[in-house]
Structure formats: structure tokens, C-alpha cells
Amino acid sequence: MAVDNVNHPSHYCNNKAGIEVIEVTGNLNFDLGNAFKYLARYKSKKLPAEDVKKAVFYLNHFYANIQKLCKIVVCAEEEIPALVKKMERFCEVEDVPCIRRAMETITQAVLAEYDHLDHPLPLLSEAEWNITIADLKTYAESIADKKPEDFNG
């Protein structure tokens, strides 16, 4: 079978989770989908720190506009358990605590919406959110000179 470098490039599936990131991100709203994508793929990008910073941007945009958002998940309700299972797999294999925590936060938001809770982030206070964002920023600075081969070798 030929490799499809346009629709399913091998490097998009070449991760410890063994799942193409779009299987998760295509089911989330724009901000959380982008944040999850950047968190899941930063180690394979030319400028890893930049991708972590992009994730921070989208997480902050999400948090600032949380009251205006209609939905976190854009798939059918019966598809959410499978989506959460894939998200949890990405969390399980992530070895950097602040990246894993951010992914878990997005997963919690999906679960909260699925459980029809009033607020999409009931398990994360504003202080905890700020710590998560600060930790991501610090981590991005700490990997500023790293390249993908530094994570995979």
C-alpha cells in the first residue's frame, strides 16, 4: 500500500500513542483541537518550543472565551467515549508532566461536557489553570534550543 503523504503522512502517526492526532482534534472545538494538536506533536516538529507556545496561545484563547463557546466537542455524543479513550492514550504516553497535565485538562473538559456539567472545567480552578499555563511556558523556554532528534534519541 502506498504512503499517503497528503492525507495521512506517516510522521502524523509516528508517536507513542499510535493514533493519528486528527482522530482527536477533528472532534474538538477549534481552540482545544489546536492546543491538543500542538501538545501531541511538538516533539516531532522543527521548533518544538514554538509548538508548545502555540498550544499555550490556544489554551488561553479558549479560557478567555469559555463563556461564549457553545460546544467543546463537535462529534456525536455516542462517539465521545471512544474520543476520550484516544485522548487518554496520548496522556498515558506523554512523559513530560506539564504537557500531560494540559492534555488531561482538555480531556477533563470533554468529559465535563459529556456529563452535561454546567462549567466545562469543573476540576480546574483559575489558580490551577494559571499554574498549568505557566508550567507550559517555562517548559517551552527550557526546550528552546531542542530539535526533534533530541526527543527521539
Where are these regions (language model features)?
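Intrinsically disordered, low-complexity regulatory regions
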Residues: 1-153
